[in-house]
């Protein structure tokens, strides 16, 4: 039987296919001039080895602080990403395919403003133009846009498992998440935990996410209400439209900034109905206890708007107090094979007798499961275990040659990270 994102590296043929799809998106953005802001609305600190970037204020203020505080990290991620032999992208392909594709991407004005400010912050931090040797030219604003669209072009393999109620030792939810991708040392070495605090008048929720320097979207995170978001690539249905695709990391940021317990499913639906994805994605949302509705849900989404507005919801069975997500659709599109990681996580959940107190899910057990579902040949860039009721994230970042779940985890208090110190 065929494998779906099995424990083998993806072939480079996916890159070419994704690049073709990437060209089918909408809006032109000029390169901004350098400008200054009166203050830096951010801080960069460390909890043990984990860098914590805290940003607050408007998109412009947050973007400038991001660039000012992490400029060298962003430059390293971008330049070494292009130079990686694992991706098969050459200079001509980048300049002739990816950059023209960016001119057709649809980016919300607030995100464009934030990226422009980030570019200005990087320039201010280095006090000079930034030469990218691989491209034989200076860094441009459009390159920052490319970083934030990179996962729309080159796919990731990830795993998540969520358990709650009778499946956990204390009845409270636990979520484990591995983020697996190509081995690119500069990206592994320049991961960040980012805490974002929007202005109260914005109506947006504060959140904490984990990703690479330069990314303003969200692939792994928890918001101030305890909503947990994890994303996973999947093989979706072919798009029914040819333009107007949104970078999915920015779409998922919209989700985490606007989703609350009690209305979570509707909140996510409202965002996805306004955002068209050009690729297949699984978006898993887990909700703290005490709310009406499901404890977790997976949204299987792609660009086929003729089928259920572009996404299909997958809920846990009524008898189950767990939900698993890897890299394939299970409802929207018939699975074409097996996924070893999904099967392993499913077997582990089924082995638990919810009527006994033995062998139930704990934070420690989630970590052991994450160790078992790393993808050989790739690297697990980050692993996170979430406790949404307590608003706690246990975060482990990969060290070169050592997958994230095998590295020392740091416990972070999300509520504390999202406070502005007086």
Where are each of the predicted segments found?
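C-terminus-biased signal that marks the final domain/tail of proteins
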Residues: 37-157, 170, 253-422
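Hydrophobic alpha-helical segments, especially transmembrane helices
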Residues: 12-14, 18, 178, 342
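Internal mixed beta-strand/loop scaffold within catalytic domains of large alpha/beta enzymes
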Residues: 144-251
